[in-house]
Amino acid sequence: ASDVYKRQEDYFVFEAPYGEKSKMTLADGTVVWLNAGSILKYSDKFNERNRKVILSGEAYFEVTKKEKAEFTVQTCGYDVVVKGTKFDVSAYPEDSVVTTALIEGVVEIHRGEQRMEMIPGEFVKLDMATGKITRTRNDVKQWKAWSENRIEFEDITLKELVAKLSRQYDVNISLESEQVGAKRFRISLRNRETIGEVMAALQEIIPITVERRGKDIYIRE
């Protein structure tokens, strides 16, 4: 155990496995909801002055305001720097985009030398392939829906939804073609449903056929 103290810094690792969500409170009072398949790391030196966390996956944050100490979320795409606010960050390594939705307060996106300040109601998306960042205004409350056990998206493709459902329910969902995956729609469900009920609801919304064998689900037109 003495080896632990010889190193400069150790990290606490907080994980939500596939099929589960977790909630935690950090030492500064900040509350974090971690979505399925996500990992949050922070230094054992995390305190009132050093407020930095590393996120792989998706988390919804309610950050305690500290006048002189910024709170930083580091992701694979950019850093989100805040004072005190409510926001959602999604940065799964397997996804092609990194997104931030700001519900309340102010955050700043840092990518290399680039700085972008966000205001409530804004949604920022980084395309990891091109490096392009886009900013839009939409109903950002949908981005915290998962932390309240709801599935709610105003405009989502089947491919995007399937990636989220696979993590949330710990299943393998395959799409027959890119064409099926490109279908766009709006969906609003209570997240208490089983994956079977979610698939049944999807078939009501868009013209698809779903086959299921245990954890494997196949979707075609």
List the model feature ranges, each with a label.
Residues 2, 6-221:
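A residue-level detector for the "anchor" residue at the start of short, highly conserved motifs
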